[in-house]
Amino acid sequence: FLSLIPHAINAVSTLVHHSG
């Protein structure tokens, strides 16, 4: 789970950066 947290954050960050 701990390893999945950063993975999810990275995906969200990419989406936000792409959307912004």
Curated annotation (Swiss-Prot):
Q: Where in the cell is it found?
A: Secreted
Q: Give the GO biological process terms.
A: defense response
Annotated keywords: Amidation, Amphibian defense peptide, Antimicrobial, Secreted
Q: In which tissues is it expressed?
A: Expressed by the skin glands.
Positions where Glycine amide occurs in the chain: 20
Per the record, the domain of life is: Eukaryota
Q: Which cysteines are joined by disulfide bonds?
A: none
Family per UniProt? Belongs to the frog skin active peptide (FSAP) family. Phylloseptin subfamily.
Name-wise, this protein is Phylloseptin-O1
Q: Which organism is it from?
A: Pithecopus oreades
Designated gene of the protein: psn4
